[in-house]
Amino acid sequence: MRKLIAAINMTLDGFCDHTAMIADEEIHQHYNELLSNAGTLIYGRITYQLMESYWPSVVKNPTGNKPRDEFAVLIDNISKIVFSRTLKNVDWKNTKLKKEVIKEEVLELKQQAGKNILVGSPSLIVALTQLDLIDEYQLGLQPIVLGSGLPLFKNVKDRINLKLLKTKTFGCGAVTLYYEPTKK
């Protein structure tokens, strides 16, 4: 059974903002390893459009930064599923469009052979958390305080107890916390 891993960066005060992160070589290498061990990425519309608007262009025109360019190739080649009620089509290669999150479909995806499944969209992390489908949370805490923004767990309705599996620290001051939900 494949694990469904919620992997996302957030500020120390709990907000998700792609501009509020340190994207140095060490962080990119970390995410390259994460993508190398994944077989599928799941996105919501907003995160999909953000990623799709940038990474394919890096594949075509590499930056010269080895970890960043490697990340671009990895994310370009991985299988992607986008959940959106408003998108009519998706143009990024290896991408399928689904209209809504259906628990049985996600469970079926987890049962398939292959590498782990990653989700990195705040709204989808909440939806999949509500459906009790997340096997592991990898929360990349950035050494930044925003004071406002999109809080990751704002719409989670029920308490979720987590067990700390490990931590990983980075030279820039970021820390990734690895958690798994404990049984209720």
Labelled PLM ranges:
Residues 1-184:
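Enzymes that bind and transform nitrogen-containing heteroaromatic metabolites
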